[in-house]
């Protein structure tokens, strides 16, 4: 692949050509990706970290998924899968699509944190959520 002098920015969507050699649920081929890496690192590196964007809206309430508003350049309503991240070489970029707004990027950042948090943090967050729900329903006990 030829080296491209492309400046990518956190929050930008690109169509990228990802390697086809994958197994299981790992995404591959020509597909949209969202730049998640910090801008200072994007400037210094020929690669960047990106989350997969898919038009298959499954498990939309999963804490690592963020449904995007309708975006020009994406043929269908799509979703970011924060748990599916890649190191993408800038030479793999096919074209620029668009940039998501700050409120969407905040949701994506939360989803990225959830995908990387420890099991203990996840367990505590879930326990707190269920305890709150029980209180709302007027139930007591554990």
Residue ranges and their predicted role:
Residues 2, 6, 70-142:
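C-terminal terminal-subdomain/extension
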